[in-house]
A protein has these predicted regions:
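A short, Lys/Arg-rich alpha-helix, primarily the initiator
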Residues: 1-19
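The alpha-helix within a helix-turn-helix
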Residues: 11, 22, 50
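Residues that mark the N-terminal boundary/hinge immediately upstream of a DNA-recognition element
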Residues: 17, 42-45, 56
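Key DNA-contact positions within bacterial/archaeal DNA-binding proteins
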Residues: 19, 30, 58
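Recognition helix of helix-turn-helix/homeodomain-like DNA-binding domains
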Residues: 26-41
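Short, basic-rich loop-to-helix N-cap that marks the start of a DNA-contacting helix
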Residues: 38-51
Length: 68
């Protein structure tokens, strides 16, 4: 399972609000909503987020392995 908690932690650490993401960085509300609910986003979006936030992919998401 992919979890986007690191993304929201990164935003907090950098002092970036959801409003700023949408207005200054052009990220859609739908993308933020998908991430808030741990739904999929494209690799292109991950790449763009890394460029915008000057961070690495692990600052955007983490993979949680389900125990069988």
């Amino acid at each position: 399972m992919i979890n986007y908690k690191p993304f929201f932690d990164t935003l907090k650490r950098k002092g970036i609000t959801q409003y700023k993401l949408e207005t200054e960085y052009g990220l859609s509300k739908g993308t933020v909503d998908n991430m808030r609910h741990n739904r999929s986003i494209t690799l292109y979006t991950v790449e763009e987020l890394c460029k915008m936030l000057k961070c690495e992919p692990w600052d955007i998401f983490e993979i949680i392995v389900d125990k069988v």
